[in-house]
Amino acid sequence: MVLHQQRFSLDHGAFCQTLAQTENLLIVQDLDGVCMELVQDPLSRRLDADYVRATTLFAEHFYVLTNGEHVGKRGVQGIVEQSFGDASFVQQEGLYLPGLAAGGVQWQDRHGKVSHPGVGQTELEFLAAVPEKITNCLKTFFGDRPHSLSPEQLQTGIEASVLDNVASPTANLNTLANLLQDFPQIYRDLQETMAQLLDQLMAEAVAQGLGNSFFVHYAPNLGRDERGKEIIRWAKAGDSGTTDFQFMLRGGVKEAGVLALLNRYYHNRTGQYPLGESFSARQAPPSHQDLLHLVKAQFDPALMPLIIGVGDTVTSQVDEATGEIRRGGSDRQFLQLIQDLGDWGNHGNLVVYVDSSQGEVKNRQPLQLETVAGQTQVVAGPGDMRDREEPLKINVAFPGGHDQYVAAFKQAAQRRRVHFSQ
């Protein structure tokens, strides 16, 4: 059975062969938890230099798509530079990871040139003030209640939690969640306080005439409510729930980023932009069906590549009180779009899941494995086992996490180099 017809395949050899021998190929890959460990402090992230080199062998067939950012203190640019120990070498050799960050509104090329298509200066100025507000909110929160953290722990926790991203300032509570693991109610109150802060920021944006500029992203989440707002995943025993509270530019959603990347890919192949040269993720329609319709209307299906979507954040949870299924995860929508585009074009696109639950962040459900007739199989995915109508079909799984995926990716890159040099 071919890979796109399989569920949770562990045939990584076939996966490598697909990447190595498919000429018209587009890889759209998340970063954190996929090609590097999911850690509490983003400043401690590391990238394998050989993996970075391997991405260059895919040339214009590889793009990243992340809710993190390329630039800034916690940007991926610095992680790549650290991998090689020489920023000028990375820039000259074109070793930066190309693609979209901040959900789809921050573009970077191989040489580290960064832009924000469709973003106004007033919007960036508003975002620049957000990190200080997050810092002040955290200080007030801990100043208003008794807690067991030492001054040093609290300072470390706050510094690790405030991500001063240019286009997506974020409160990342991973470190504080770990420090507060014996005080679940304080952490639960902290989640609620962060959500209230983001609501307050939205109100301030509206007052300044920027009501249509931003939205709130929670990661991981439980999907969206009837108003289109993302639903927080509250912490529970052994599960830190939503840890990333992001104030993002509207249009900065990964599924819109898929269209922006596909638009660039077609231009690389044909010299023409199906959606126009100036198209950005911010111009994409908001609904899944409208995104599909736009692709069907503007992109030549005969030129459509085999798209490989790679992510690590997909959730589903059954509400114990109502029985309602909440499906979420920051990678769900872009992976679903890639799956549906494959169904439309009959190209057999692949949805690839990397199990990042072994990392420091404890809010992922690990894949469950069993040995059946001598073969290891995935018997339970990252969602709720009671969700029998899960629409997202994960084709290939990497239960060994980012190390296992990176090893396969590097192998595929070398095979591709040999295959297309003959």
From Swiss-Prot:
EC number: 3.1.3.69
A matching Pfam family: Salt_tol_Pase
Highest taxon of source: Bacteria
Any one Gene Ontology molecular-function term assigned to this protein's record: glucosylglycerol 3-phosphatase activity
Disulfide bond residue pairs: none
Active site: D403 (proton donor)
Subunit structure: Monomer. Interacts with GGPS.
Family indicated by similarity: Belongs to the histidine acid phosphatase family.
Protein name, UniProt field: Glucosylglycerol-phosphate phosphatase
Organism in which the protein naturally occurs: Synechocystis sp. (strain ATCC 27184 / PCC 6803 / Kazusa)
